[in-house]
Amino acid sequence: KEVVHIHAQDKVGTAQAGKMDMDEYNGLISNSWGICGACTSMTTANSMCMVAEALGMTLPGNSSMSAVSSQIRLLSYQAGKQIMNLVKENITARKIMTVDAIKNAIKLDMAVAASSNLILHIPAIAHEAGYDLPWWKYFDEASNEIPLLSHLAPGGPNSIKEFDLAGGMRAMLKELLPRLNGDCLTVTGHTLRENVEDAENYNHDVIRSLDNPVMTEPGIGVLYGNLAPEGAIIKIAAVPHGLWRFKGNARVFDSLHDGLDALRAGQIHPGDAIILRYMGLKGRFGTTAFTFQEELKGLPELYNSCAIITDGRFSGGTSGLSVGYTSPEAALGGPLALVK
């Protein structure tokens, strides 16, 4: 099994709790961090690279290539030449990043269980392009249409390197093409369909087809309920199956630091529903609960039995029963502010 950086991050809590030899932990760190470039798992950086390709804004195959490969060196040269062609043909970003292209990116998000933070970044891109539409609605619709086609770390067993060797984003987009708008223009000057028509899938265990998905549920889900009348986001592909149904007592913290203090003091118990609130965009600039989630993951008796619910966000590499972006956030009087 390939060791990637997320495996070292998952052991932070274990090491801090004294349940792992520090020499062993340092060895794991030394051998799990890859070369320069984006992370080796499905975190926000890789997610945004894949979104850029699904939008049509990169040359085909760019998003999963190694940062120091001969492939990327050749592609960078080709990109420079293609920019000049785009200028000559008057093909601009606004002609490429259409509403349909953005919807393609959202569907790709579901198929690869990309970062939950795309709920921020994709609407921000759309806003800059002049499309102020109900993007949460489109995420919700896509979550009911697109199954998980690739189970990448942290939720699954495969790395980005394995994804690339299987055929990368071109193979993924070809498998997903029946659910996409293949007529969208891309920076090649050709359509998305034309870009992937000759793509090969070299490993059908890593990149699945629509007829044989990893699971019929999407990688990312939009949740609604009495705590989130306007929605919340969860990375379904990274939730242990034993936690797909959950009931627990609320443990409420009004800041990340209070929650971490309680966790480190042994005051969090198996089965708790941990509420981390006032961490949203208006309350505290969209604070990430990733540190809490990672330390919790190092304590299996808690990670495998507890839920985290926050109006803040997580790292793209989050896993476990972790619900973020709960809306309206507590600072705006959302229901999360009433939990005791």
Write out the residue ranges for each language-model feature.
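Catalytic or ion-coupling anion/metal-binding cores of large enzyme and transporter domains
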Residues: 1-329, 334-340
